[in-house]
Amino acid sequence: LLVGCGDKEATVAAPTDSAGSEPAAVAEASRPMAEVSQARLDNAAEQPEQWLTYGGSYDETRHSSLTKVNRDTLSELGIGWVYDMKKPRGVEATPIVVDGVMYVTGSWSVVYALDARTGEEIWVYDPEVSGEDAAKGCCDVVNRGLAVYEGKVFVGVFDGRLEALDAKTGAVVWSNVTVDQSKPYTITGAPRVIKDKVIIGNGGAELGVRGYVTAYNTDTGDLVWRFYTVPNPNKEPDGAISDEIFAKLANETWGDTGAWTTDGGGGTVWDAIVYDHVNDQVLLGVGNGSPWNAAIRD
């Protein structure tokens, strides 16, 4: 992990020996961490010195209004510090930064909390994804990010778990298996937090699954609702909030036979989840059908 700053020589951040040990900048036992309220998320764009949520704000524009880095100062940038994640696989996550602490995921769904100023390690959490589960993925054991809210860090684990971690120590607060682990489901996308709910999707449509997103209570981990993106293969209710819309509009547009009825139909929401806070709606980007080959899907 490389972090840039103005015209300075790089420092190499030394990992600590155990989860939970804190460098001086964050050593105060009473110091709150990841104190991100709903109000802060609603107004994330007004705090450009922070990066509170995936995409920077609910709009997910990924735009920063900070002005110190511009055409005139670009040549002055250098490497501020370097941190070795010790996992030689792909890294696709954008870090979350809250009040001087950086939270970021690496490959194998490992979560790191670092001092954003120095790169010193605060804690590391490894969910210990197995090689057997890794074989289910289409595109490496990457992870695209996490969410923070009211003292917790939320991560979607490659093997289908959604976990809440204590932002101060990295300890697991709660853990839920969100998928049928006998099927080739994976999670590589970042969770989104909206009004005391953490929302997570999944991947795996390339190999034959049925897509859905699920909302869990951020405090307890209890399931709040689930929305499927393709109909039930038997056109039956799932006991999910998607039942009504399928009965009214979708079931009749899907055939009663075809490989989709046995291979799930696909439509996984493997990353794109956006909250429209003006209309209080969640918008989903839906992935490919399953089987991928449309000639045998229908």
Placement of each model-derived feature along the sequence:
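A structural motif specific to WD40 beta-propellers
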Residues: G80, E120-V124, A171-S175, V224-W225
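Blade/loop signatures of beta-propeller domains
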Residues: G20-I79, N234-A247, D298
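Short loop/turn segments that connect beta-strands within beta-propeller blades
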Residues: D115-T118, E128, D166-T169, N217-T220
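Bacterial signal peptide processing site
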Residues: C5-K8
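Short coil/turn linkers that define WD40 beta-propeller blade boundaries
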Residues: L74-L77, G119, G170, G221, ...
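Beta-propeller domains
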Residues: L66-I79, G106-E128, D298
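Extracytoplasmic beta-rich repeat domains
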Residues: Y83-T94, V124-A147, S175-A190, L207, ...
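Repeat-blade elements of multi-bladed beta-propeller folds
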Residues: W51-G55, G90-V110, K136-L162, T186-E206, ...
